[in-house]
């Protein structure tokens, strides 16, 4: 055995030789091993650091320098270590073998590493402690065995590691505390047994760990802690029992006299007993949130003079504020998601150093005066039931920087409530019931949130908030004062892109000191927002205001262009005048009964007139607010005028579509019924259907008034809201579009069936060619105009592809109401019924008499191809009697086609020739009386009928008779 002087001489010789080699040529020579080829080496004086990590090595390099002090072999493919592999590395102090595939380490693997202090073996596949290998490491101070598969720690696992200070055994498969193995570590200062499967902590489990300062036991399955479990931990300062299954408060902590930080959150503890922390007067931080706390002893948190952080969240059954008498050093208090209803008046006297008060998600209805809490910097009171803010509630809080009062029921704020808050930089009043906001004391605000206060239409100027950087308001019009409209409307993404500054992004973001403990407090205050208050006051060119104005939230004009403005006015004038004229001629033209189709067309004119009136209201608002719409936009959207406009628009458009569907279906069914049963449906069923259509349209228009859909989503007061609208509003708009699309499909199917039932040459089914053709024109025109509405609505609301808001707005303003003026124009210009009805209203001196109009009215009910009509026998008698009496005045100017009358319901059909009825086989009857019950086919020939345009030659009556040239 060498003597100590001999060893010293040997060591000095080695050092001198190494120094000589280091001072000579740095190129490797025959006397000096080179750095292994795949590794990266760095010299530190005479010592060497070798980094061989992440190289895919399967074996340890053999040519390592004996003076290597640091060796990193982590993240490779090592599967085994040969005995004596590191015996020549006598100066090695840190060895990293983490992230390999080691499942077993032989006994002599670390022999010769007498200077090793740090050994990292985490993230391997070890199933046991390599005890024999560790015995060769007398100087080891830090051992990492976490993230392995270790399930058992034998008693002698750490024998000989008398210098070990840090031990990581977390993320393994341990089911119990290795009590006997830990008794051999008297110098241990920090240990983690987290992320295992431990269920119980026995008594005296750590009795020999008198130097232990930090103990982590979180994320286990611990259900019970013995009364003396922590006996012997005289120097323990941090205890982490979070995320376990504790059922009762661990009274064993009373033996921890030096404990400063305690974590019990996310357990099943239901009660905190009286004097729970009596034995730990040095406690500074307690995290106790997310436990089903039902009881808190009145003295539980009293006289903890060092306590500065208390987090007690999720205790839903706690209704009283805890008594914090003697806890005068408390700086951060978090009591969220509890049932607290009232704050004691003397809370600030007990907590004079309080800086952060977080009481969100409680049931607080009234706030006391907090003027004695002079050091308060943040107050969180969101999701409570506060209704009013008094003058002295926050008075004299000169250090207050952030105040969160969102999601309450605040209706009134005293004008002087914020007047003394000179340091306030963030104020959140989202989703309250404010009508006005007092501005006194808010000049230093940099972030103001007012969203959700729908009754707050107050305009804010730049002078009110000279330092403001972020503003969130209920209406986009309130952003117009901050120059948002300077370069027309922009989307939110564009504004965010313009407000982005690379230098600000690259700047280091350090949390404020007052927020240092918030990661565990669940107090979700935005660090970036509060950082604005401490940054140097450099000028900022613009304010980031939301929601951003756009085509649906204009700043100056409701209608952006004169083209749209003139088009809307034209639609208004044409729809009101033309539909009024149609209504007048249809319903006031005389006592003659209306045909079913004509009744439906008249009802459609009334619906279209409502659409025109709604467009007129929008045009009037545009004219009255010309150039300054932002001042009135919020009040218009939330007012009764917008509701009435939207109601009329939806009622008119939906009634028009439904009535058009009814007209098409009625035409198709009538043809089928005439062919099958010889008669058309009764007019009463058509009237009932029309009333049903109007009732359904009224119901659809009333749904947004009951919060199903939304009229005030935009100043257009239409349910077709922009994509950023509420889901309920978008769903209602999609439902309307789908219903209308279904109606047009039904209409198309009905008319296809009608034409399929009328093959060429079959002329006995259609009784009113003009009205049937008019309905066909309505189907074509309205369907064609509705296609872009449906297409853009689906594309915009469902985000199928980008659609500019300007295009959507133009379609809603011009294309959507266009049928309201086009439908009556088609009737006025192309339907012969209008000219006849107009003559009845204003007869001219040369116009035919009423009898001639009656006959003409019957004759006009003819088909476009054969001009046949169904006429009752009583009507034919009137015509025949008139022919015998003489010609009415002016009748010579009115042309009638020649006709043949054929019985529809007699077995042997007859026809009229001269003054006799002749059977179909040619037999004549003298002065016969036609049957009173039944109908005749009136066949017109030799004339061009209004509305049909077809002519057939050959008159059958003598020309000398009164109607010989006409009937």
Swiss-Prot record:
Glycosylation sites: 77, 208
Signal peptide: 1-22
CDD domains for the chain: 7tmA_LGR6
Disulfide bridges in this chain: 642-717
Gene Ontology MF: a single term: G protein-coupled receptor activity
Domain LRRNT span(s) in chain numbering: 26-66
Ranges for the LRR repeats: 91-112, 115-136, 139-160, 163-186, 187-208, 211-232, 235-256, 258-279, 282-302, 303-325, 329-350, 353-374, 375-396, 399-420, 423-443
Record's bilayer topology term: Multi-pass membrane protein
Extracellular side: 25-567, 620-644, 709-727, 796-809
GO biological process, one term: bone regeneration
Annotated localization: Cell membrane
One GO CC term on file: plasma membrane
Main location: membrane
TM annotation in the entry: 568-588, 599-619, 645-665, 688-708, 728-748, 775-795, 810-830
Tissue specificity of this protein: Specifically expressed in multipotent stem cells in the epidermis.
Family to which the UniProt record says this protein belongs: Belongs to the G-protein coupled receptor 1 family.
Protein name: Leucine-rich repeat-containing G-protein coupled receptor 6
């Amino acid at each position: 055995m060498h003597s100590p002087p001999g060893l010293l001489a040997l060591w000095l010789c080695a050092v001198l030789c190494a120094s000589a080699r280091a001072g000579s040529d740095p190129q490797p020579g025959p006397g000096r091993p080179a750095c292994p080829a795949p590794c990266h080496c760095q010299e530190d004086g005479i010592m060497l650091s070798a980094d061989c990590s992440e190289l895919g090595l399967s074996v340890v390099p053999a040519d390592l320098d004996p003076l290597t002090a640091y060796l990193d072999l982590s993240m490779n493919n090592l599967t085994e270590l040969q005995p004596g592999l590191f015996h020549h590395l006598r100066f090695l102090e840190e060895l990293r073998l983490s992230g390999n595939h080691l499942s077993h380490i032989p006994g002599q693997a670390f022999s010769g590493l007498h200077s090793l202090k740090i050994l990292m073996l985490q993230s391997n596949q070890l199933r046991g402690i390599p005890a024999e290998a560790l015995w060769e490491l007398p100087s080891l101070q830090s051992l990492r065995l976490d993230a392995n598969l270790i399930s058992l720690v034998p008693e002698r696992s750490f024998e000989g590691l008398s210098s070990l200070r840090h031990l990581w055994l977390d993320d393994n498969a341990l089911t119990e505390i290795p009590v006997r193995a830990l008794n051999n570590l008297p110098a241990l200062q920090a240990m983690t047994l987290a992320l295992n499967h431990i269920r119980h902590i026995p008594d005296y489990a750590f009795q020999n760990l008198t130097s232990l300062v930090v103990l982590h036991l979180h994320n286990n399955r611990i259900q019970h802690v013995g009364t003396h479990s922590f006996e012997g931990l005289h120097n323990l300062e941090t205890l982490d029992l979070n995320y376990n299954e504790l059922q009762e408060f661990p009274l064993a902590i009373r033996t921890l006299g030096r404990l400063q930080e305690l974590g019990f959150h996310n357990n099943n503890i239901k009660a905190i007993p009286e004097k729970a922390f009596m034995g730990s007067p040095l406690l500074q931080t307690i995290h106790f949130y997310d436990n089903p706390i039902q009881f808190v002893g009145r003295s539980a948190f009293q006289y903890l003079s060092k306590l500065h952080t208390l987090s007690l969240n999720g205790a839903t059954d706690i209704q009283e504020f805890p008594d914090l008498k003697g806890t005068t050093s408390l700086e951060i208090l978090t009591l969220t998601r509890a049932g607290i209803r009232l704050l004691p008046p003397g809370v600030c006297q007990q907590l004079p150093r309080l800086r952060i008060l977080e009481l969100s998600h409680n049931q607080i209805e009234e706030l006391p005066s907090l003027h004695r809490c002079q050091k308060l910097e943040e107050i969180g009171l969101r999701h409570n039931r506060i209704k009013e803010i008094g003058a002295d509630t926050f008075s004299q809080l000169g250090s207050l920087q952030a105040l969160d009062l969102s999601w309450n029921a605040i209706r009134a704020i005293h004008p002087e409530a914020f007047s003394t808050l000179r340091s306030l930089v963030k104020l959140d009043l989202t989703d309250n019931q404010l009508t006005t906001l007092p501005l006194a004391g808010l000049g230093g605000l940099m972030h103001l949130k007012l969203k959700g206060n729908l009754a707050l239409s107050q305009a804010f100027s730049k002078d009110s908030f000279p330092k403001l950087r972020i503003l969130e308001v209920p209406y986009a019009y309130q952003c117009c004062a901050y120059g948002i409209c300077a370069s027309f409307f922009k989307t939110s993404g564009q504004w965010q892109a313009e407000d982005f500054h690379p230098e600000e992004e690259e700047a280091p973001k350090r949390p404020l000191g007052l927020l240092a403990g918030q990661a565990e407090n669940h107090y979700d205050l935005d660090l970036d927002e509060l950082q604005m208050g401490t940054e140097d006051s450099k000028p900022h060119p613009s304010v980031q205001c939301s929601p951003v104005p756009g085509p649906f939230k204009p700043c100056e004009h409701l209608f952006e262009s004169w083209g749209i403005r003139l088009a809307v006015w034209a639609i208004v004038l044409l729809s009101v005048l033309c539909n009024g004229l149609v209504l007048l001629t249809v319903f006031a033209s005389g006592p003659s009964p209306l045909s079913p189709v004509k009744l439906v067309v008249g009802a459609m004119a009334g619906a279209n007139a409502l659409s025109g009136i709604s467009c007129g209201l929008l045009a009037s608002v545009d004219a009255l607010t010309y150039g300054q719409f932002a001042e009135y936009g919020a009040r218009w959207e939330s007012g009764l005028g917008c509701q009435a406009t939207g109601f009329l628009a939806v009622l008119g458009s939906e009634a028009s579509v439904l009535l058009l569907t009814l007209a098409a279906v009625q035409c198709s069914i009538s043809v089928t019924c005439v062919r099958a049963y010889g008669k058309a449906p009764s007019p009463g069923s058509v009237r009932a259907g029309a009333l049903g259509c109007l009732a359904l349209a009224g119901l659809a228009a009333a749904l947004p008034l009951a919060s199903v859909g939304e009229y005030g989503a935009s100043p257009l007061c239409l349910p077709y809201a922009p994509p950023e609208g509420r889901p309920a509003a978008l769903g209602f708009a999609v439902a309307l579009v789908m219903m209308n699309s279904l109606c047009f499909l039904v209409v198309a199917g009905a008319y296809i069936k009608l034409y399929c039932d009328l093959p060429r040459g079959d002329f006995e089914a259609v009784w009113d060619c003009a009205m049937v053709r008019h309905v066909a024109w309505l189907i074509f025109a309205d369907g064609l105009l509705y296609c872009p509405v449906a297409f853009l609505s689906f594309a915009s609301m469902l985000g199928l592809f980008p659609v500019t808001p300007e295009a959507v707005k133009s379609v809603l303003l011009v294309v959507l109401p266009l049928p309201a003026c086009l439908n009556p124009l088609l009737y006025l210009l192309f339907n012969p019924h209008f000219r006849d009805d107009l003559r009845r209203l204003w007869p001219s001196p040369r116009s035919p008499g009423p009898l001639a109009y009656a006959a003409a009215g019957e004759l006009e009910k003819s088909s476009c191809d054969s001009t046949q009509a169904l006429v009752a026998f009583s009507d034919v008698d009137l015509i025949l009697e008139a022919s015998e009496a003489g010609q009415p005045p002016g009748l010579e100017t009115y042309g009638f086609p020649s006709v043949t009358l054929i019985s529809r319901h007699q077995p042997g059909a007859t026809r009229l020739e001269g003054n006799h009825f002749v059977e179909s086989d040619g037999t004549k009857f003298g002065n016969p009386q036609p049957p009173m019950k039944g109908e005749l086919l009136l066949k017109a020939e030799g004339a061009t009928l209004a509305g049909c345009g077809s002519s057939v030659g050959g008159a059958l009556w003598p020309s000398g008779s009164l109607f010989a040239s006409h009937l």
